[in-house]
Amino acid sequence: MKRDKRLEIIKEIVTNNKILTQEELQSLLLERGVEVTQATLSRDIRKLNIIKKRDKGESFYSFLTSGNSKINSDLQLYFYNFVISAKSVGALVVIRTKLGEADVLANALDDERDSRTDILGTIAGADTLLVICASEKAANILTAEIKYILLG
C-alpha cells in the first residue's frame, strides 16, 4: 500500500477512535488490511503530527492542532515535548522547560523572528527560557498559544 493512502487511513482511525497505544493503532490498521511495522508506524505518527495527549490520567493519541496559532508545527512539537509551563509578565514570557531544553527552544524561537515581529529575542538557561516580546499583548498571545499546545 502506498504511503499516502496509509496516512489517510491512520488519520481516519485517530480522528474517530480513542487510541491508547501504538499496538492498538497497528491492530486497527491490520483490520483494514494495512500491515505496518512499529518503526514505520512511528515515522507515520511523526509525519502526521500525532502526539500523546493526557486527559484525566489517561494518555491517548491525538493530532497536534494549532487553532489560530502562528507557531509552526515543528516548533509546536518542541513546545509539546519540552515545555513544563509558561507565564507572561509584562512584555516577557517565562517558559520552564525540561532540563537542558531551554536553549533548543530559544534557538527555534530565534529562527522564527523573521516571520514573527512580536518576538524580539530570547535568553536561555538550563531549564528556563525568557522570551522578550514587542508588547504585553504579544506576550499574552504567545503564552496563550503555548498553553493551548500543552493543554489542547
From Swiss-Prot:
MF term (GO), any: DNA-binding transcription factor activity
Subcellular locations according to the entry: Cytoplasm
Any one GO CC term of the record: cytoplasm
Location (main, coarse): cytoplasm
GO biological process, one term: protein complex oligomerization
Gene3D superfamilies associated with the record: 3.30.1360.40, Winged helix-like DNA-binding domain superfamily/Winged helix DNA-binding domain
Pathway: Amino-acid biosynthesis; L-arginine biosynthesis [regulation]
Keywords for the protein's UniProt record, in alphabetical order: Amino-acid biosynthesis, Arginine biosynthesis, Cytoplasm, DNA-binding, Repressor, Transcription, Transcription regulation
HAMAP family assigned to the protein according to its UniProt record, in alphabetical order: Arg_repressor
Known role: Regulates arginine biosynthesis genes.
Family: Belongs to the ArgR family.
Record's protein name: Arginine repressor
Organism: Lactococcus lactis subsp. cremoris (strain MG1363)
Lineage, broadest ranks: Bacteria, Bacillati, Bacillota, Bacilli, Lactobacillales
